UniProtKB/Swiss-Prot annotation:
Encoding gene (name): der
MF terms (GO), sorted A to Z: GTP binding
Homology family: Belongs to the TRAFAC class TrmE-Era-EngA-EngB-Septin-like GTPase superfamily. EngA (Der) GTPase family.
Species of the source: Mesorhizobium japonicum (strain LMG 29417 / CECT 9101 / MAFF 303099) (Mesorhizobium loti (strain MAFF 303099))
Name of the protein this chain belongs to: GTPase Der
Occurrences of domain EngA-type G (ranges): 3-167, 208-383
HAMAP family with a match to the protein in the record: GTPase_Der
Pfam families per the UniProt record, alphabetical: KH_dom-like (PF14714), MMR_HSR1 (PF01926)
Amino acid sequence: MTFKVAIIGRPNVGKSTLFNRLVGRKLALVDDTPGVTRDRRVHAAKLYDLHFDVIDTAGFEDAGASTLPGRMRAQTEIAIHEADLIFFTIDAKSGLLPDDRTFAEIVRKSGKPVVLVANKAEAKGAQGGMLEAWELGLGEPIPVSAEHGQGMPDLRDAVIAALGEARAFGEEEEGEDDEIAATEVLIGEDIADPDAEDAHTYDNTKPMRIAVVGRPNAGKSTLINALIGEERLLTGPEAGITRDSISVDWDWHGRRLKLFDTAGMRRKARIHEKLEVMSVQDGLRAIRFAEIVIIVLDATIPFEKQDLQIADLIIREGRAPVIAFNKWDLIDHPQELLAELREKTERLLPQVRGIQAVPVSAETGRGLDKLMDAVLRTHKVWNSRVSTGKLNRWLEAILAHHPPPAVAGRRLKVKYVTQAKTRPPGFVVQCSRPDAMPQSYVRYLSNSLREAFDMPGVPIRIALRTSDNPFAGRAKKRG
């Protein structure tokens, strides 16, 4: 990447829509409600032959430093400091508001090169807003429609004019594709990067994707900030600060990681606003594309019904869960509570028996190294593979000790087992009558597999297949 662009402006001028247009996918939540974006989101972007990082930011608001809008503004000011170029974005349809003038002055004082982006230029009445924009003193406004992809060639030329050709083009990375991205139709709303892989093409050099989930106000954003050692994500006492899933790249002892902060997940019955529905859906996508999911529980009120529903979703999706009992600094009798919580964990989540559960304090930093050790151990188990020879020796011993029961007077026969996949470990068991096999015996096989091959804390999939003789029927044909 050659440079970094921050998209700045008051709420609801279309910053996230422009961000999505530049990255070529619908990553940021977009809604008519002002203030949807709260954290700053960074992603690789492409504008014709220009390659750069783009930062989506919260809308600038004039507010006290200790308030939520004030803390959002502080995150935006960090983005201005990090950026090489500012896209100061206005709504040409509605024209200038007092906040546009106030924040234009802040951007001007930063001394950074600025491109004045007049968004929603396709709307009726936008011409008046375009003329007003000259009053900001930020140069010629570039008319665009982020929603429809209009005006992108002019935006590209404005970037080159602001930075100069040498800075704008810089040193191209090998093998990069110069296809036009910003004018294409946006498809999909996935949270994952395009490097999603299946079990057979897993590349250990790619960043491990870790989603951090939990109920509102459990301390998810604070935990990520504590892990990476900076105030990267907006935090505070208000529940529901995080709205869309924000990814943060991080290196832990040489291991590349991508952390996804997600919106707090409440019970469906309590979700009424469209924006919260969108936020939760965004979090669900983060889970589906993650490898590890850290479930953050508030240790002062752990194992609410919603916590268990979140854990069940993660297990059904086949992700590898790790539990973080957060706010451990508030606990008076930690040893007694830890023993109680671990017993509850085993009892309430039998599908992932042996799950890693670590007490942490995102506020003080206690337990974070142990949490990351648990993440790496769980990831290794989630990727584990057992040879067919070992599996069938195990099966032989299991059948001798505890054969499957008889059903309708006929004993079920289990003949062969092999591992079909990893991430999570999945096994195919050949048996005489798959439909008749009791689920209790399938659970027995799963628990025995987990214990015999040291696979604690991850979902194990077992598929039953018929063991029909492939040569059956030939004698009949000869007859």
